[in-house]
UniProtKB/Swiss-Prot annotation:
Domain of life: Bacteria
UniProt family annotation: Belongs to the FBPase class 3 family.
Organism: Clostridium botulinum (strain Loch Maree / Type A3)
An example molecular function term from Gene Ontology annotations: fructose 1,6-bisphosphate 1-phosphatase activity
Record's catalysed reaction(s): beta-D-fructose 1,6-bisphosphate + H2O = beta-D-fructose 6-phosphate + phosphate
Cofactor(s) demanded: Mn(2+)
EC number assigned by the record: 3.1.3.11
Protein name as annotated: Fructose-1,6-bisphosphatase class 3
Pathway(s) of this molecule: Carbohydrate biosynthesis; gluconeogenesis
GO biological process, one term: gluconeogenesis
Pfam families, A to Z: FBPase_2
Keywords per UniProt: Carbohydrate metabolism, Hydrolase, Manganese
Keyword Amino-acid biosynthesis: no
InterPro entries xref list: FBPtase_class3, Metallo-depent_PP-like
Length: 668
């Protein structure tokens, strides 16, 4: 308390109004002192485990399994606790039981001859494991993680040692009673879920929940139930967020990508988006067009010829609409400097050519039934009606709106957390490696200020419903974040969607990356970024997604001498033949950083029936001799501030500046 002697009393007086409010929560010296003791104790607990996952791309089965096994953390805990006392097959079965308790129990009940014996052994093992994973938390925090049905019993078992002679009968009788009253299955499910929850204290999703995979809505539903999560938006997330906000160009892009990969389940089944008007429109305008270049790219999907024909026509129809809608934004926003993407007016329908950068290219598809030569970016009456119907469908999808609000409330363009800087794409740079200046809303911005501004504009796109002008600019910016040349999410000079559909020349398909990617292995670049974001240069890391790591070509996810880590999760099956693996995830626990590479996941069914887990290899990036504690984290800094405030409150009580509440009043 020496800080608050007579010489520093003015500090307390200056904060008296706040301290009086704080006294409502801690109305006595006793209550304030108790809280200081509690908080000081928390500071000395081990740091909680953080789990970093990126680029999920809608692949819900792989992601669900990764979430359940915490990138191998649960298996490592089983190894730590049971070592050589359990066979490998028993460890594997125990892990699978924790991941999928309901499904695994159904199988065990059918095959196990002595179920009561199995229950007893398994309960002891699960309780022992739960004791270990809960040991780094306060009892209060563990209590909040417990299911109400079994909260008291689990807490008793966690805080008792079964090998203590004086409590052994008590401990054993609880377990035997659980089995006797036929509640063992429910208890196993409950404690397995508690273990899953406690092994990871914080989950970071570094972008691209959405894309071509079939279950983005399933993933977000699961994430919305997670106890502690943050999200750094990816380019595929932002285009869906823009679509939900009502940005027509984003809506067209979302539908086009879904049709390109024959993934309509998220749109139709997940969010109830009605695509029948698009199908009708496509059949009317492209009836005689085989739309060869718009055939869906399918992996593990059996589509009949009729389905492929319809999807191809819908795909082409929405693509042309997309180019028109994008043209309107480009013309409306000259500050975007995207005039070179205005290509519809460069088409010579009669000659079947495109004038691209003063060079004439032959078009491989020359059927443009909805294109007006005089006004190529104008929607015809049928197109305008279709776009309005699709927009209404997106805006009025209750589930989509709920999921996008979740992304807004738990997400941002970047995050500083425990000396790590998390973002999906890049920080735009110049060719010389300096931070690139970008002019938006008559402001010239770069680095952190640029991302902060873009983050605010993205929120205005969704929430500024009573300010149409700001909302429209925000929606246009959402589209820019998807494909603009200085977008930190896109990270490329241009998106050559039109060229890939209509030109054979592969050179026109190239998408030049921002210089950021050239400098990713340069520690100087990391230093520039750390200083820009006010992070400790010596002890910070950039954790990045977006670009798959081509492991089979020898690429290393560890860049700039460990300052930058690329953890594209590799969930997207289309990239796996190129990368050679199924991507990387990161674990940051009290002992250091662990980078885990993963082999492709077979299926949840095989995981349950055969005990197949994702095969993973772990690299220890950093290992500390002394475990990191809560006091070394951002949460620790907040707790220190709380302690500081409570110490001021104690002095205020003791100096008579604030009166303690009568103990009787406090109690009654």
């Amino acid at each position: 308390m020496t800080l608050y002697d007579e010489n520093n009393l003015h500090i307390i007086k200056d904060n008296l109004r706040y301290l009086k409010l704080l006294s409502k929560q801690y109305p006595s010296i006793s209550s304030a002192s108790s809280e200081i003791i509690n908080l000081q104790a928390i500071l000395n607990l081990p740091k909680g485990t953080e789990h970093f996952i990126s680029d999920v791309h809608g692949e819900y089965e792989s992601f669900t399994h990764m979430l359940k096994n915490a990138s191998g953390v649960i298996k490592r805990k089983i190894d730590d606790v049971f070592g050589t006392s359990l066979r490998e097959c028993d460890k594997r079965n125990l892990a699978t039981l924790i991941y999928y308790p309901e499904q695994k129990l159904d199988l065990i009940k059918k095959s196990e001859k002595n179920l009561e014996d199995w229950y007893k052994i398994t309960l002891y093992r699960l309780i022992r494991l739960c004791q270990i994973v809960s040991s780094k938390y306060t009892r209060s925090k563990v209590r909040k993680a417990l299911p109400s049905d079994f909260a008291y019993i689990i807490e008793e078992l966690l805080n008792e040692q079964g090998d203590r002679v004086d409590k052994q009968e008590y401990y054993n009788s609880i377990i035997e009673t659980i089995i006797d009253i036929d509640r063992a299955s429910e208890f196993i499910i409950a404690i397995s879920n508690v273990i899953q929850r406690l092994v990871v204290d914080k989950l970071h999703i570094i972008g691209d929940i959405y894309d071509r995979g079939p279950g983005a809505e399933i993933i977000i539903e699961a994430l919305s139930k997670h106890h502690s999560i943050d999200i750094q938006w990816g380019n595929h997330d932002i285009v869906w967020m823009g679509a939900a906000a009502g940005c027509e160009a984003c809506i067209a892009n979302v539908i086009r990508i879904s049709l390109r990969y024959a993934n309509l389940s998220t749109l139709e089944d997940g969010y109830g988006i009605n695509l029948l008007p698009l199908a009708t429109f496509a059949m009317d305008f492209y009836k005689e067009d085989n739309c060869e270049n718009f055939k869906p790219r399918t992996i593990d999907k059996n589509l009949n010829k009729t389905d492929i024909k319809l999807l191809s026509k819908m795909h082409k129809a929405i693509s042309i609409i997309q180019f028109k809608l994008e043209g309107k934004i480009i013309k409306r926003r000259p500050e975007f400097k995207m005039e070179e993407r205005l290509l519809l007016d460069k088409i010579n329908i009669k000659e079947g050519t495109l004038n691209l950068n003063e060079k004439i290219y032959k078009l491989i598809d020359t059927n443009f039934p909805t294109l007006d030569k005089e006004n190529p970016y104008e929607l015809n009456e049928r197109e305008r009606d279709l776009v309005e119907k699709l927009t209404n469908s997106f805006i009025n999808s209750e589930k989509l709106q709920r999921h996008i609000k979740f992304l807004y409330s738990n997400g941002s363009l970047y995050l500083k957390y425990n000396s790590n800087l998390l973002y999906h794409g890049c920080i735009p740079l110049n060719e010389d490696g300096s931070l690139k200046e970008v002019t938006l809303c008559k402001e010239t911005l770069k680095g952190k200020s640029l991302l902060d501004k873009l983050d605010r504009l993205a929120r205005e796109a969704y929430f500024f419903k009573k300010d149409p002008e700001s909302k429209l600019y925000g929606m246009d910016m959402m589209w820019y974040l998807w494909c603009g040349p200085n977008s930190p999410l896109f990270g490329k000079k241009k998106m050559t969607t039109f060229e890939r559909y209509f030109l054979d020349d592969k050179d026109t398909h190239k998408e030049e990356k921002n210089p950021y990617y050239k400098y990713r292995n340069d520690e100087k670049m990391c230093t520039i970024i750390f200083e820009e974001f006010e992070l400790d240069v010596d002890n910070s890391h950039i954790i990045n997604g977006h670009i798959p790591v081509k492991t089979k070509e020898g690429e290393n996810p560890i860049k700039a001498n460990g300052k930058l880590l690329v953890i594209d999760g590799g969930f997207c099956k289309a990239y796996q033949p190129q990368t050679g693996i199924a991507g990387y995830t990161l674990i940051y626990n009290s002992y250091g950083l662990l980078l885990t590479s993963h082999e492709p996941f077979s299926s949840i069914h095989k995981a349950i029936v055969e005990g197949n887990d994702i095969l993973s290899s772990t690299i220890i990036l950093e290992h500390v001799s002394s475990r990191k504690r809560v006091l070394d984290t951002d949460s620790g800094e907040e707790i220190k501030k709380q302690i500081h405030d409570l110490e001021m409150l104690l002095v205020a009580y003791r100096k008579g500046l604030i009166k303690e509440e009568n103990e009787a009043n406090i109690r009654f």
